[in-house]
């Protein structure tokens, strides 16, 4: 679902106070698919272990996400959007497009 965004650094809305990934095992035991930019507030606002923003199960079918990518679809939703970009939608839309394609394939 997120493979087309591999290596990207993207802004995203965070709006939670209670959510936090507590991961007691070593990082290699988890399928962490997205991380906050750096450890600590404000980048990692809830202090999640290993700067974890998103986790996926081993099959790739189940994604758990703390950031609100659904609130970051359009450039006017972003607090800061890079100058000179001409996107109609933000790169986060890729996650939803990929999910739909996967669903259509496994019908």
Which residues does each PLM region occupy?
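Amide-donor transfer/coupling interface in amidating biosynthetic enzymes
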Residues: 1-107
